């Protein structure tokens, strides 16, 4: 009992992953004997180097819900292609349910201009210069998933050149 290891809240020391809880919600289920209380946790996990995931965990206590959320987030990891200025290669829209998120690259030094869960997902993915706008819904989970949807659609210049069958230099000429 004396040699218990302390667990870090934010970063995993061995792998460099950081987790942030976006929302803790107390939910109820009506059963025959009354109401059963449980907690739903939405969290984002990322290594700030181009990998990020969103997870949801439900349990009777918050700690159990967070653990389930971390395992769920690790199952839904997305790799983000970052530019040299730590932005995204091109503008993109992401959709999840009624939530629509517009993501646009911005100039170096402008920072992450976004709100709510969108900001958390973008920061943990390693994007440092971006403009984002939420449209349609204020739902935390749907907006976070909409960002992931948009980030999965991103393509690098080399991927676009390969798909078109042209040399990459032709994409840069005016």
UniProtKB/Swiss-Prot annotation:
Cell compartments where the protein resides: Plastid, Chloroplast
Protein's UniProt keywords contain Lipid metabolism: no
PROSITE patterns attached to this UniProt entry: RIBOSOMAL_S5, S5_DSRBD
Subunit structure: Part of the 30S ribosomal subunit. Contacts protein S4.
HAMAP family linked: Ribosomal_uS5_B
Protein purpose: With S4 and S12 plays an important role in translational accuracy.
Protein name in the entry: Small ribosomal subunit protein uS5c
